[in-house]
Amino acid sequence: MPESAAAPIHLPKTSESERLKRIRHTTSHILAMAVQKLFPKAQVTIGPWIENGFYYDFDHPEPFSEKDLRLIEKEMVKIIKRKLPVIREEVTREEAERRIRALGEPYKLEILQDLEEPITIYHLGDEWWDLCAGPHVENTGEIDPKAIALESVAGAYWRGDETKAQLQRIYGTAWETPEQLAEYKRRKEEALRRDHRKVGKELGLFIFADPVGPGLPLWTPRGTVLRSTLEDFLKKEQLKRGYLPVVTPHIARVDLFKTSGHWQKYKEDMFPLMAEDAEAAAHEQGFVLKPMNCPFHIQIYKSELRSYRDLPLRLAEFGTVYRYEQSGELGGLTRVRGFTVDDSHLFVTPEQLDAEFLNVVDLILTVFRCLRLNKFKARLSFRDPKSDKYIGSDEAWSKAEAAIQRAVEQLGMEHFLGIGEAAFYGPKLDFIFEDALGREWQLGTVQVDYNLPERFDLEYVAEDNTRRRPVMIHRAPFGSLERLIGILIEEYAGDFPFWLAPEQVRLLPVGDEQRPYAERVAAQLRERGVRVSVDRSGDRLGKQIRNAETQKIPVMGIIGAKEVEHETVSIRTRAAGDVGTFALEHLIAKLTSAMAAIHGDIDWS
């Protein structure tokens, strides 16, 4: 590295840094103290640290403005500079209640009711205190006032319940050094530039419409081409590996999900029951939108008696599922209410489990490589034995977790443990992708399941003619197709690789007299599967080029009188500018070769 080059600034995650956790937690208290000093009518609720900072929720009759945030920020700096001691105090429940009632803080009183003893209070000097379990810094002077910033105000419901009071959530960020804060702001600005909601609108890929509803994207022709290209790619990979396509409906009787356990363990995330009448509703009889595809694939498995010779049976579907996300949790394509999962369920014998699991991991890694998603880590998402959110026996869980552990050890794959991250019916191997801005997203997943085969009484006839229970593998290399596309838009900043671009080539005729030849070239390219258009605007060539580059078309074909005479096309790319003039057949060969290679670039030499 040249001596003048600055080393990249590492931004630690809150979960990785005890010091940063304390800084952010204390800064949230400083925020609350500042708000109550400036706005005495504000009532406090909760204020935790989060991944990139902190927030605090307030009940205040007037909305906080941008001007208010700057005033609050200045007050926070004053508090920090006073170097107030942060003092922990243990009190009885009765004493805590007495103090809270004296302050007139109803939300804190409700929080107190759920707390177990000992009850702890943290003081900022002798002027302000909060119910809190910690941890915190010892003195506000440990926080660098130049390394904090308030960012925004958003609405939030008390305890996440839309039927309860709407609060104002002030978000802030805090770092160890001003340099880290500056780097965080730089990355945030870059994230705004890449935001898939902004870029997707500019490229005309998808829309949201109020009459349709929040969290329900509508895909335009260009966006649908992008979706279809991804689906076709995975379908071909699955075909090579012996997967069989299936299609299942969007709704089913609620009893199906009672058997699977979704109704008992996942009901809050499902859309409400569709009952024919009040009596049916009272007895929880009717239909529901499916939250997952697995119970449907199980019914296909059960439709006939299976032999060990039929296994492994690999059923695959791009199935749309529905989750009732709260409106405040929705976010573009990455958090929606209706989304498509590249779902597959493998029914295998216990002896086939390890090999099939490894084959699924190989498929996921192939997908990541082709999509150029190279920075990821594997998480062993196991159950929390202390939680009651899971179904099945301890023995089934132990066997499933052991199978995943064996696989990652056999592959020599770096991994980390995520206790409590399992699905309610089985453990998972999740692939966590880190994007260009250091943000983490869960994409591919593969799960081992002994529980649903038991709940649905699945069987196969073994070689000794006895009835045995298969094991299920759930897998989704993409995860949610909507989320994947949102991530890809931001990772590529809308500049998709050639094979994936919704519009791969745009032909730019210099004048009207060159347009007939451009149309003939386009027709020949379409016959070979190239996604091509002709600019029919009549604009000058320079404007045509600018428009194509703005719309991130990877290849532009310029056609003037010389190109018509010699039946050639002059090529310009977004990546390299002018790359030369090519005979039509030569150009077609290069483009189709690049499409077949998928993750390779076009060789223009």
From Swiss-Prot:
Name the principal localization, coarsely classed. cytoplasm
In terms of InterPro entries, this protein maps to:
aa-tRNA-synt_IIb, aa-tRNA-synth_II, aa-tRNA-synth_II/BPL/LPL, Anticodon-bd, Anticodon-bd_dom_sf, Thr-tRNA-ligase_IIa, Thr/Ala-tRNA-synth_IIc_edit, ThrRS_anticodon
Q: What UniProt keywords are attached to this protein's entry?
A: Aminoacyl-tRNA synthetase, ATP-binding, Cytoplasm, Ligase, Metal-binding, Nucleotide-binding, Protein biosynthesis, RNA-binding, tRNA-binding, Zinc
A GO molecular function annotation here is: metal ion binding
Q: Which PROSITE patterns match?
A: AA_TRNA_LIGASE_II
Pfam families documented for this protein: HGTP_anticodon, tRNA-synt_2b, tRNA_SAD
Its cofactor is: Zn(2+)
Subcellular location, record wording: Cytoplasm
Primary enzyme class: ligase
SUPFAM superfamilies reported in the protein's UniProt record: Class II aaRS ABD-related (SSF52954), Class II aaRS and biotin synthetases (SSF55681), ThrRS/AlaRS common domain (SSF55186)
Cofactor remark: Binds 1 zinc ion per subunit.
What cellular component GO annotations does this protein have? cytoplasm
What's the catalysed reaction? tRNA(Thr) + L-threonine + ATP = L-threonyl-tRNA(Thr) + AMP + diphosphate + H(+)
Q: Where does Zn(2+) bind?
A: C294, H345, H474
Job of this protein: Catalyzes the attachment of threonine to tRNA(Thr) in a two-step reaction: L-threonine is first activated by ATP to form Thr-AMP and then transferred to the acceptor end of tRNA(Thr). Also edits incorrectly charged L-seryl-tRNA(Thr).
> What protein family is recorded?
Belongs to the class-II aminoacyl-tRNA synthetase family.
User: Which protein are we looking at?
Assistant: Threonine--tRNA ligase
Question: Which organism is this protein's natural source?
Answer: Thermosynechococcus vestitus (strain NIES-2133 / IAM M-273 / BP-1)
Gene that this polypeptide is encoded by: thrS
